Amino acid sequence: MSSKNETTGSNRSKSSNEIFIGKKPLMTYVTATLVQLANEPSVVIKARGKSIPRAVDVAQIIVKRMDTLGYKVASVKLGSEAVKSQDGNTRNVSTIEVAVSRNST
């Protein structure tokens, strides 16, 4: 289930159904994801490096705590990106993409 992507952060483009996880409070991302899910059939939660546990938390809060809304984890993609650090070295940074969608039942 893991794949390796050799891209840099500058090549990424944001589509309307993607949520990028950063350093903001957890519930900020939960709210943003729920707003997107109201308009889209599925949303992809993306994170890199130290933000990966926060992305998993966001997905689990939506699926488990808000089970009355009927959302599920559709897929999980793991990978890595080659990123140039400030000192000029190339480092591999782990990535995760969690797709959350509505239950069809």
Model-derived regions, located:
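Long, charged, low-complexity intrinsically disordered regions
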Residues: 1-42, 50-105
